[in-house]
């Protein structure tokens, strides 16, 4: 199963929470999730492609991609790419998520409570992603392109060495196989 691969960012690039939220509202349709503390993690998660749940301060917000920002390109149209291209790079200054120390990636199996914990300890904002679909994964592969970093979290994890078969000398000399 493909699960979400969430993001936590250590700072707001010099902005206050209010200024950052205003920037987010310019990019997404944003609504505060009322009574978030009383809701289950499932209720706080994004429900469809183009939605992100954001934890900022002590509040959860649902951020919906505006129609004009949707992209038919198999890689640029992925939710992880859109978040990177529309918000993380231009607003938070995270040019390369592979090398920038200000962003951390949290596998979906760890849950939204881990995102809250990170914002309460060492991060300023966290984003819960809608999981990349198998169809999106195949579309990227069929186009001969590469998935963005940290865009998929697979469960269950395959055990290391599960598909390794030892080749012994006698195996290569045995022509009866």
Question: Where in this protein do the model-derived segments appear?
Answer:
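Surface-exposed, charge/polar-rich loops and edge strands
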Residues: 1-177
